[in-house]
Regions:
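Basic, polyanion-binding surface patches
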Residues: 1-182
Length: 182
């Protein structure tokens, strides 16, 4: 999937309202992917994203130690991979190989991009004050890569009970916004 550079200050278009993401990590020569159902944009400049990663998750230690990751945005085409990745542990499985995903090199972090995803956000851990108590990591997006089209990809939104909603239809009210609120 061909990507173009994208301003990291504008990534909220891809992350709100909370799509399922695949978080890739790397540490000591090993890579992993986890499915993440909850993240939040916390600041626009610099672009900060908060993620809750369960302490028992294999990715937790990899990300805590490496202090970086890539937040990858899958579309509906990757629904089965999203579920499969969430149902196994990277401690025993190479998830890139098992789910037929291509690890592409990132430019600012060691963690790989997932080539098949519509967007990839390279992140560095900038605040771990809430990790010990809440497993809450705050990342700064240091590089953003997005597919040239579609502008608004069909993303997955987990509703629980094995059911996803699909984003895709857009309603524009751009003219009604104050410029600084866009």
């Amino acid at each position: 999937m061909k990507k173009r550079d994208f301003p990291v200050s504008q990534i909220r278009r891809y992350l709100e309202p909370g799509p399922i993401v695949l978080v890739s990590s790397a540490f000591e020569g090993k890579t992993n992917i986890m499915t993440l159902g909850w993240q939040t944009v916390m600041e626009f400049t610099p672009s900060l994203v908060g993620c809750m990663i369960a302490g028992g998750n294999h990715s937790f230690e990899m990300i805590r130690r490496s202090r970086e990751c890539v937040i990858n945005l899958p579309t509906t085409k990757l629904t089965d991979q999203v579920v499969g990745i969430g149902n196994c542990s990277g401690a025993t499985v190479d998830k890139f190989a098992k789910f037929g995903l291509a690890a592409a090199p990132a430019t600012h972090v060691q963690a790989p991009l997932i080539a098949e995803c519509a967007a990839n956000f390279e992140c560095r851990l900038v605040d771990d004050a809430m990790v010990r108590k809440y497993n809450f990591f705050i990342f700064e997006v240091v590089k953003a890569h997005v597919a040239a089209s579609p502008k608004y990809p069909q993303t997955l939104h987990y509703t629980g009970d094995g059911v996803f909603m699909v984003a895709g239809k857009t309603i524009s009210r751009r003219a009604k916004f104050r410029p600084e609120m866009l």
